[in-house]
């Protein structure tokens, strides 16, 4: 085996190791820069039920204004509860995912779409 071939293999192996280390560092830094919170899971779940991205954006804005996606949120003056801020005491005993389901049903029954509910909220500061 010529000496150049062995050196080439060592050099090639070193480059591959270097690239692998860089990729590993990059993946690690991405993991650390974005850690999932319960709110991220609530939004992901809501987005899975509201497929249209534009409609989800409206819902995200609406419920951020209403409760900041907090399932324990309670508006004492208005008597509204949960992520969707509905006037139903049952919501305070429901998990966040069930609150999202109920809230989406309410939006559909009252406003047909999240964007219609958001437009109403912009005019009246409630939906």
What are these regions (language model features)?
Residues 71-73:
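Major-groove DNA-recognition helix of helix-turn-helix-type DNA-binding domains
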Residues 29-68:
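Export/targeting segments at the very N-terminus of extracytoplasmic proteins
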Residues 12, 21-24, 60-69:
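Phosphate-binding glycine-rich loops and adjacent basic patches that engage nucleotide phosphates
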Residues 1-41:
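N-terminal secretory targeting signals
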Residues 27, 56, 111-114:
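Intrinsically disordered, low-complexity regions enriched in Ser/Pro/Gly/Gln/His and often acidic
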Residues 61, 75-127:
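Catalytic and binding regions of secreted/periplasmic enzymes and modules that target cell-wall glycans
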Residues 5, 40, 52, 95, ...:
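Acidic-enriched, low-complexity/disordered segments with a strong bias for Aspartate over Glutamate
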């Amino acid at each position: 085996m010529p000496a150049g071939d062995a050196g080439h293999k060592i050099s090639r192996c070193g480059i591959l190791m270097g690239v692998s280390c860089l990729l590993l560092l990059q993946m690690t830094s991405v993991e650390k820069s974005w850690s999932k919170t319960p709110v991220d899971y609530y939004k992901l779940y809501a987005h899975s039920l509201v497929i249209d991205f534009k409609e989800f954006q409206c819902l995200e804005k609406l419920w951020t204004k209403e409760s900041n996606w907090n399932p324990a949120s309670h508006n004492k003056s208005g008597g509204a509860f949960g992520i969707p801020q509905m006037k139903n005491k049952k919501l305070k005993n429901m998990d966040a995912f069930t609150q999202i389901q109920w809230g989406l049903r309410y939006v559909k029954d009252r406003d047909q779409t999240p964007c219609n509910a958001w437009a109403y909220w912009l005019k009246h500061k409630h939906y």
